[in-house]
UniProtKB/Swiss-Prot annotation:
Contains 8 disulfide bonds. It comes from the Eukaryota. One of its GO terms (molecular function) is toxin activity. One of its GO terms (cellular component) is extracellular region. Expressed by the venom gland. It comes from Notechis scutatus scutatus. Keywords: Disulfide bond, Secreted, Toxin. It is found in: Secreted. Residues 1-15 have a biased composition (Basic and acidic residues). Belongs to the CRISP family. Its main location: secreted. This is Cysteine-rich venom protein notescatin.
Amino acid sequence: SNKKDYQKEIVDKHNALRRSVK
């Protein structure tokens, strides 16, 4: 379950970065 949460956080961070770049 921890792994899933970690991956979800990474995706969120990636999304935020992509939004910031755009």
